Amino acid sequence: MAQGEQGALAQFGEWLWSNPIEPDQNDELVDAQEEEGQILYLDQQAGLRYSYSQSTTLRPTPQGQSSSVPTFRNAQRFQVEYSSPTTFTRSQTSRLSLSHTRPPLQSAQCLLNSTLGAHNQPWVATLTHSPSQNQQPKPSPPNRLTGRNSGRVR
């Protein structure tokens, strides 16, 4: 790879790593949380650093529509860096979704369990958590899908 391509790739990586999903200015904030932490693998002289953020906003009803069904916008961002004497890995996942039901808040731990080695190694963690001040409603019962293909195994 040419030096110019490497520089452009590094610049894009830094931009991607530093720019979170921004909420729409017209949306009303419903829930927000952030988590950061560090895991040390003492026996491997390695470490993992992570950050997770989630925000849920309520979208306003478009002008001229009289819909009483709310629309929630959920933005999630998970970043992780793993560093050892022989390896450096950086990963980021962003997810943006719209739904008519309020999504539950998640924790970074469920995402860390999918990170190589994070779920089965002894670790020391530092965790900061800032939960939403808004009360979470009771979860609604799960919806059941019915139709031509429901219940059919392929």
Swiss-Prot record:
UniProt superkingdom: Viruses
Keywords: Transport, Viral movement protein
Record GO biological process: transport of virus in host, cell to cell
Pfam families linked: Luteo_Vpg (PF01659)
Region (Disordered): 83-103, 123-154
Biological role stated in the UniProt entry: Transports viral genome to neighboring plant cells directly through plasmosdesmata, without any budding. The movement protein allows efficient cell to cell propagation, by bypassing the host cell wall barrier.
Similarity annotation: Belongs to the luteoviruses movement protein family.
Protein name: Movement protein
Gene source species: Barley yellow dwarf virus (isolate MAV)
